[in-house]
Amino acid sequence: MLKCLFVIAVVCSMVACNKDYTGQWVSIKPGKSLRGWDTDGNKKDFGYVGDTLLLTGQSTIYYSGRINDARFKNFELLADIKTEPNAVAALWLHSGDVSGYQVLINNTPTSEERRKTGSLSNVRNIYKSITSDNEWFTLHVKVVKKHITVKVNNILIVDYVEPDEPYRTEENKGMRFSYGTVALSNYSNNNVKINSIHIRPLPDQEIPERKDALDEQKDEIIRMQQANFPVIDFHVHLKGWNQEQAMAHSRKIGVFYGIAPNCGIGFPVTSDADIYTYLDTTKNLSCFNAMQGEGREWPTTFSEKAREEFDYAFTDAMTFTDHKGRRTRLWMPDEVWIDIDHEKYMDIIVDRIVKVLKEEPINIYVNPTFLPEQMMPEYDELWTDVRINKVIEALVTKRIALEINARYCIPNEKIIRAAKEAGIRFAFGTNNADSDIGKLEYCIDMMKKCGITERDIFFPVVKPVKSQYVTGK
């Protein structure tokens, strides 16, 4: 009788192990003894408070349970997670000894780790979390062949297709889609809480393969991502496209955007109420919220409280009152009156730039050193050392970053080198006139020529956001 019961138990166990879970959501949350998971560290780095799993130390746990024999290729995963301040963790996918991708978990705006929650590490880095510490959020990852999407609270953050020949550095050569287990790593000594983890294996057959991967062998952006250089266009406008189109393009090319409305008299945003209305439309966008101040009246047009709702503010000095009291806009040929010699007019431009930098509440000076079209052929001669130094001194004094502008290809290399020597931070920006935004080509060229490193790049301190928590399974 006992022998018969033993055989039945073994058979039942084998049936359970061999069960096909394809298309089914299954919990793979570790048991309180980490049942179904292995660890590369001390089990004391993991524990439970009630039904909540705690990752308390710098260790990794690997799923080793019975679902798909812990070998996943096409799948979806949902996890409900909460972080303490300064916690940095990761979810590993297709993990093996030296392979796999990791999705980062980091919600602290001021942490030294700039890559935030949802980042597909060093492939599609995200620089602003749409959730906050001490709040539950849902991480949703889906892998189909060579296509991965990452959602946070049901908001699409990453949409990446791995090409047949991806660009990978030697350090990151294991970042390839194949198959493997999933793992959780805590890179800090701050707690990460896991309320649930569910996985759904997907079928191998009848899944069309995405064919819209970029050619990474010729792509500069992936090289910067692999080097953990912050790939950010701080100066993007919704001109010629809408929010959804801009976000889709950002995800595709791997450049994180700072999207700015034009704020000032005669522009789309003209009041504090307009600011709050605009920001209400950006709650579900994975981007920086930037403010472009227009004209010289903008600091008094908007309250300080409303201005500070943005992640950062910028302006240029292209609008000013000239030597005869005429309102001048340097980029509009019919609103520029050069009735004195170019040297004298250049002194007026420099004086107006310095005044703007000293008096207006900005983080970045954009469209920098711009000259009207009549004077552009003399750009290098007109921007003398004395004039350059006046602008650099004002930037240093007010701790303002200098934009390297991809659209106008300014400032020139000489000015950028002088700014770097003075310790000024840089922001790459486009100031697009339409949806043909490019990929920061001039900025990257100057980065290489002038030896700009990731520590030379401006980075805003953003306010924590209120999570729009959508529970998982």
Regions found by a protein language model. Name each.
Residues Q58-I61, P85, H237-N242, Q292-W298, ...:
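Short beta->alpha connector loops
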Residues A9-Q24, R223:
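Bacterial Sec-dependent signal peptides at the C-terminal "C-region" and cleavage site
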Residues L214-A227, Y379-K473:
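Charged catalytic cores and adjacent phosphate/nucleic-acid-binding surfaces used
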Residues S271-T397, I452:
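Extended substrate/RNA-proximal surfaces in nucleic-acid metabolism proteins
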Residues P230-D233, F256-G258, S286-F288, D311-F314, ...:
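Structural preference for beta-strand elements that scaffold enzyme active sites
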Residues C17-E216:
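Carbohydrate-interacting regions of secretory-pathway proteins
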Residues L214-E297, K305, P372-E381, K390-V391, ...:
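An N-terminally biased module of ancient metal coordination in phosphate/nucleic-acid-related enzymes
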